[in-house]
């Protein structure tokens, strides 16, 4: 194999592979990236048990061939090269890869290409659709943060992806796409109605493993405005901007999220998001790293009171609510959960709906009607 390619172009597929490449792999080959050169250009493949990433890039291919080398080492070398550099990759004896740029050269010891797992992404198209990438990117941002990290609860280790016809007399290519995640103490739901193409008209529901869902963010950074979602066997393949991510489906039953989301709270207040976030940050500066100290949120006529106590002291802050004349309510929350919602929602205002110290809090914003968040209270 012998190819020449601009440094900037080479950096893109290597960057997209980084999240999949294992730092401490049980199988050494999973720390490597497979490079295939043909007359069509370069194809980079990185794989682990739940995710496979394939990224393509145009290149001047002098001699076709393949190489398998440590993906992080190659990425570190390439990104450190001067901007505008032309990089030459060539294979030598004993599976070594030579990297040249100007008067500099590097060698990486590799593996035989046949030792790399066969490409797990099937070339045949499955059932799916083509849609606006920006919608998927936004929904993913607003749900991925609340995925459970506890491996003993596999159904919660991913993002539920639902696709269904819009119905109600809408055109056949009008669908509703929904993403939901929960860790058992909080829940996030984001949905959008959008016009798509190549839709099969069927309802689909899959749980995307969180590692694969995270990798989608890398390919969504590309310039291509569209993304294709395909359902192939037990996997979901999402393609955009000359890159494909295959995510393993978690074959578990996702909880019935509709039973968790309250319709309304007994009390509803709308706040300026930046003001609320700043107050929560200041008051929660006394919070322990274990997150076992609740932020006490109290509503009473004309104001919201935020309080927190810790061994080192206590904090008290008030926010004026001139329009609130409802009942007095006091609830405890993990302050980080409140801040997480404010961060991912990113709207000018946020609405909190509360009932009592034992009931979940509903958070949403008029600017984003398709997004709702639920936070369970903490014992005070």
Regions found by a protein language model. Give the residues of each.
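Structural preference for solvent-exposed beta-strand-turn elements
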Residues: 1-380
């Amino acid at each position: 194999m012998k190819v020449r390619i601009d440094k900037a172009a080479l950096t893109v597929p290597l960057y997209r592979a980084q999240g999949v490449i294992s730092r401490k792999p049980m199988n050494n080959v999973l720390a490597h990236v497979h490079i295939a050169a043909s007359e069509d250009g370069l194809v980079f493949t990185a794989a682990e048990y739940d995710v496979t990433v394939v990224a393509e890039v145009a290149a001047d291919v002098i001699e076709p061939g393949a190489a398998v080398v440590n993906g992080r080492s190659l990425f570190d070398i390439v990104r450190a090269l001067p901007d505008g550099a032309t990089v030459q990759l060539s294979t030598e004896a004993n599976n070594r890869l030579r990297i040249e740029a100007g008067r500099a050269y590097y060698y990486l010891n590799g593996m035989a290409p046949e030792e790399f797992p066969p490409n797990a992404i099937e070339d045949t198209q499955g059932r799916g659709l083509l849609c606006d990438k920006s919608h998927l990117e936004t929904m993913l941002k607003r749900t991925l943060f609340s995925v459970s990290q506890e491996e003993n609860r596999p159904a919660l280790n991913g993002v539920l992806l639902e696709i269904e016809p819009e119905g109600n007399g809408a055109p056949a290519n009008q669908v509703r796409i929904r993403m939901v995640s929960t860790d058992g103490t909080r829940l996030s739901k984001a949905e959008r109605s959008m016009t798509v193409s190549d839709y099969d008209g069927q309802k689909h529901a899959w749980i995307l493993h969180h590692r694969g869902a995270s990798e989608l963010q890398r390919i969504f950074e590309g310039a291509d405005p569209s993304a294709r979602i395909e359902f192939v066997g037990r996997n979901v393949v999402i393609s955009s901007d000359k890159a494909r991510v295959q995510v393993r489906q978690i074959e578990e039953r996702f909880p019935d999220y509709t039973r968790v989301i309250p319709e309304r709270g007994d009390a509803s207040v709308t706040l300026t998001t930046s003001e609320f976030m700043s107050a929560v940050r200041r008051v929660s500066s006394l919070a322990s790293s274990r997150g076992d100290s609740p932020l006490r949120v109290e509503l009473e006529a004309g104001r919201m009171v935020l309080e927190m106590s810790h061994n080192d002291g206590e904090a008290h802050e008030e926010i004026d609510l001139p329009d609130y004349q409802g009942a007095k309510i006091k609830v405890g929350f993990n302050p980080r959960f409140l801040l997480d919602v404010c961060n991912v929602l990113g709207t000018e205002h946020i609405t909190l709906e509360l009932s009592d110290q034992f009931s979940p809090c509903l958070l949403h914003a008029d600017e984003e009607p398709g997004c709702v968040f639920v936070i369970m209270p903490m014992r005070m």
